[in-house]
C-alpha cells in the first residue's frame, strides 16, 4: 500500500453528483462496496431534506448504483459478519436502519433497527444529534459513534443496548476503529459547533 489513487468517482451510474458528498463506505466480503450519500448541509446548518442515499458498487464494477433512498442524512454504514444484513445510520432521525442484502447486492426489507432516543438519554437537543459511523465485530455487535452525543453505543444484533462508552474528550464523536487486544479507537471533535473541528483520538481498552 502506497497511497496511490487507483480510481475516482464523482457521479453515480446516472451521471448525478453525490449531493452532500460520500459520507462513509463499507466493503462486503465478496469485494462489493456500499456507500452513503449524506445529503445537503445548509448554512446555517439546519436539516433541510430527506434525500440521503445508499449506493452499491458490484465486485469488479465501474459504476455506483443507487440501492436505497429517502434517508434522513445517511451516515455510517456496516455489513453483518454473515453478509446478510446492512446497517446504516440516519443521523437526523437518531436512528439506525437495517436492510436485507440480496444475492445481487440490492437491498430489501428496510426497517428500523434501533431508535437511539429510546435507548439512551442525551443532554444535547441539537437536530444533528444522532448516529455517525459504525463498526461491527465478529459477533455481530454494532459499535456506533453518536454525533453531538459524546458517546459510543454498543448494540447487539437484535438492537439491544449492551454498553455506553462515555467520551470525555468532546461531544462530536464521529468514528470508531478496532485495534489490537480488543481496543477501540474513537475520533472526537471537542465541540461539534466549532468550525475548526478541533479534535482528538481516544483509545478505549477491552471493549469486546
What are these regions (language model features)?
Residues 13-34, 39-41, 48-53, 64-85, ...:
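Beta-rich, blade/repeat-based domains predominating
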Residues 40-52, 91-94, 147-148, 193-197:
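Short, solvent-exposed loop/turn segments at conserved positions within beta-propeller repeat blades
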Residues 93-95, 99-101, 114-160:
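Loop/turn-rich, solvent-exposed surfaces of beta-rich toroidal or solenoidal domains
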Residues 52-55, 95-97, 151-153, 198-202:
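A short loop-to-beta-strand structural motif that recurs across blades of beta-propeller domains
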Residues 99-106, 205-208:
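Short loop/turn segments immediately following beta-strands, especially the blade-tip
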Residues 2-8, 60-65, 103-111, 160-163:
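Beta-strand initiation motifs
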